[in-house]
Amino acid sequence: MHRSIPASRAIMAMGLLFIVGFAGGYYLNPLLSPPTVIWENDSRWRTDRISISGSTTALPIVNACAIAFMNKYTGTSITVSGGGSGRGYSEVIDGVVDIGMASRPPKQKEIDDAKKKGVALWLYPIALDAVCVVVHPSVNQTLKLTLQEVGKIFAGIYTRWSEVKPGLPDEPIYVVVREPGSGTRGTFEEYAMEPYGYTVTDSAHVRPSNPAVRTTIENTPYSIGYVGFGFVTPNMVVVALAEEEGKPYVYPTVESIASFKYPISRYLYLVTSTRPESGSLTDRFIDFILSPEGQEIVEEQGFLKLPKYPPGG
C-alpha cells in the first residue's frame, strides 16, 4: 500500500528553511544553526519576567534552560509549566503566556483561532526529537513493525500480540496513548493512523504526559505506547519502524533522527504570538536556547541539538 508522506515530514526531509508567510498560517524562524548571540548593553530585561507553557516533551529542555538562564542572569524570572502542545498554542494565542512549547506545527484550527484574534504565530525550532514506539519487555526483546502494523494495534484491529507477528505472546495488547491535544499524540497519529484511516481504539489507556506513559509501559506487561526520544529507558523495548512493507526497519538513534531516516522524526518548537521585540527577555531567552550553551543543555536532557545544516540541505 502506498502511503502519502505527511506535509510536515516532507518539509523537513527536503530541508526547506524559509519564513512561511502569514497567508500560510504562521511564520517559521529560518535559523536552525545556533546563532552568535550579541546583546546590546541594556539592563531593562534583567528585571523582567515571562511565562511559558505547553509540550511535555519540550518541558525538560525549556525548564533546564530557564534555570540556567536565571542562574546566569539573576533578577530575571521565567516560569515553565506543561499541559501539552495544545495548551501551549491556545495560551499563546489568548495571551496567557509569553511563549508556548510545541512538539508539532499548529493545527488548522489553531491557525484559524490565531487569525481571528489578530495573532501571527512565530515558531522557533529548538531541538530534534522522535516519537518512539515502545513496548514492555514481556512482549519481546526485539520487535520490528511497519507503520501500518503499529496503526492496526492502536486502532484495536489487532487485540492480541499473537495476531501481530508469529511467535509473539498470545496475550491481550494493553494500548497506552497520550491525551487529545498532545503534540506527541498528534505526530504519532499523523504517521501511523491517519494515512490508513485509523482512529484510536476506545479501549486505549490515556496518560497525560511522557513520564506517565513511560511509567505505565515499564510496569505493565504486554503494553505498547509511544514517548519522545528523551524519555526512553532501559526498562522498555524500542520498536524498529519501517514506513511500509519492503522498506528498511530503522531504530531511533542520534544518527537516524538527525538524518530523518527514522520514520517519526520531528522538531520541537517554541512559539510566540508575534516576533519578539529585540532585546526583550523573550527574545533573549529564545536566543539562549539556540546558543551553543543552550544546545548543550538540549543534549544533556537526552534530545538532539539542531543540525548545522538542514537535512537534505
Locations of regions flagged by a protein language model:
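Exported/periplasmic ABC-transporter solute-binding proteins
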Residues: 6-313
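Juxtamembrane low-complexity tails/linkers enriched in Ser/Thr-Pro and polybasic
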Residues: 1-4
